[in-house]
């Protein structure tokens, strides 16, 4: 039995994006229409729509809002630099592992992946904020880059062997060239889940299908083979065609591509950051607060509800858990929510005000109601994803269903409390 309820109104943004994507079809693939059905609708709406602000442009509130945006831009810069440093560290650790492929080095590489991926998820809110301030052209490119950097779910059998299919995947298909251009062309060529790029392809290569038997991929599968066996010689194999050697090459190519893709997205943001700083004083406080409210709301709706909780309600476990191979979904979701808290509480204006305090001034009930829902949502989500990490031994289907519905209700309430600020801004 599945509990029935209506999807919230924000899902209706889907049609707006399809229309916009039709207009710029040459820059937006059909796959991205499906993958990013909502993200790109906000740029024109939030940056170009006229506002009838109830806040005077010279008011203290407006100057506080400007200060908070400046502070947030600095945080985005710092986070992007941290992600870049973590990715570079991952690449260095990978090089060490390729040189000496043992279990100790593999564990260090997995730890490095977790650090890099968590730092990327911590910056999730920035990407939702950027859609409101980045040009339409750059928005489309950022959406494509996001698909290349962090798409999930992936189809593991498209990458490497899986249970009962020991010869599956690009790693074992010697007809597939592993040069960077071809690997990029293979990414989502037939289906969105047929990924060859990004964090989660690396995740599967590093851990393997450990959800099946609880045993992660051994380091021996990355050990270089420098001599062919008699059977391989008779079959006319070449060293570069062997699974171990292809796996080593594949993970190296993907890592370089990830660094390249994130570097490009950072460049786009750096350019946008400079341009935005020059025109902050053209934004009213109402407009800026709406951008912040929308960024938080859409992160919760798109990343948590639409991509994960709603599919989980239909028992689509394999497609709803972000990091099943490393079993780090609770960490990733916690990082996303921590990113929201940093924006609300840690950034201060010159007068010492936080965005949280500014929101309270527009919605007196916000302080108690928002955080009650937000904190409960975080606890619910961590418990849910922790219980589902080993979904073959998880709770009963009925218990899981009720847990998912509870999380959906809490996250939806959190979004509704933010929406009240939006309403009060117009009063």
List the predicted regions and their residue ranges:
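Mature extracytoplasmic or organellar-lumen-exposed domains after removal of signal/transit peptides
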Residues: 46-427
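Cys/His-rich zinc-coordinating "finger/knuckle" motifs
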Residues: 34-36, 414
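C-terminal motif of bacterial Sec signal peptides marking the signal peptidase cleavage site
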Residues: 25-27
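Residue-level marker of intrinsically disordered, low-complexity segments enriched
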Residues: 9, 21-22, 53
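N-terminal secretory signal peptides that target proteins for export/translocation
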Residues: 1-11
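Bacterial signal peptide processing site
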Residues: 29-32
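Sec-dependent signal peptide recognition
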Residues: 12-20
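Short, low-structural-confidence N-terminal segments
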Residues: 38-43
């Amino acid at each position: 039995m599945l509990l029935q309820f209506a999807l919230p109104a924000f899902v209706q943004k889907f049609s707006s994006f399809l229309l916009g994507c039709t207009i710029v079809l040459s820059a937006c693939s059909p796959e991205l229409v499906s993958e990013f059905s909502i993200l790109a609708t906000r740029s024109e709406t939030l940056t170009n729509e006229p506002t009838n602000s109830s806040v005077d442009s010279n008011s203290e509130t407006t100057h506080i809002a400007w200060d908070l945006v400046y502070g947030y831009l600095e945080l985005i810069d710092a986070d992007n630099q941290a992600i870049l440093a973590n990715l570079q560290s991952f690449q260095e650790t990978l090089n060490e592992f390729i040189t000496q492929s043992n279990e100790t080095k593999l564990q260090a590489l997995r730890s490095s992946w977790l650090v890099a991926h968590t730092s990327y998820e911590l910056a999730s809110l920035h990407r939702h904020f950027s859609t409101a301030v980045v040009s339409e052209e750059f928005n489309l490119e950022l959406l494509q880059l996001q698909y290349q950097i962090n798409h999930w779910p992936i189809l593991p059998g498209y990458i490497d062997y899986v249970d009962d299919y020991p010869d599956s995947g690009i790693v074992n298909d010697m007809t597939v060239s592993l040069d960077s251009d071809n690997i990029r062309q293979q990414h989502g060529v037939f289906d969105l889940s047929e990924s060859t790029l990004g964090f989660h392809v690396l995740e599967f290569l590093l851990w393997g299908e450990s959800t099946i038997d609880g045993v992660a991929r051994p380091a021996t599968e990355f050990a270089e083979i420098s001599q062919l066996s008699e059977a391989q010689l008779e079959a006319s194999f070449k060293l570069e065609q062997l699974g171990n050697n292809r796996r080593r090459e594949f993970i190296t190519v993907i890592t370089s591509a990830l660094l390249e893709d994130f570097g490009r997205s950072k460049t786009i943001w750096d350019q946008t950051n400079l341009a935005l700083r020059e025109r902050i004083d053209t934004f009213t406080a109402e407009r800026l607060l709406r951008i912040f409210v929308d960024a938080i709301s859409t992160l919760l709706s798109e990343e948590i509800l639409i991509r994960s909780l709603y599919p989980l309600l239909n028992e689509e476990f394999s497609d709803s858990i972000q990091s099943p191979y490393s079993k780090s979904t609770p960490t990733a979701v916690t990082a996303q929510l921590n990113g929201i808290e940093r924006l609300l509480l840690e950034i201060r204006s010159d007068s010492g005000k936080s965005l949280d305090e500014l929101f309270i001034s527009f919605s007196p009930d916000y302080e108690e109601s928002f955080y009650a829902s937000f904190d409960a949502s975080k606890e619910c989500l961590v418990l849910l994803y922790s219980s589902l990490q080993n979904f073959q031994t998880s709770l009963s289907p009925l218990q899981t269903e009720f847990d998912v519905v509870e999380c959906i209700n809490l996250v939806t309430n959190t979004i509704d409390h933010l929406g009240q600020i939006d309403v009060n801004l117009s009063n």
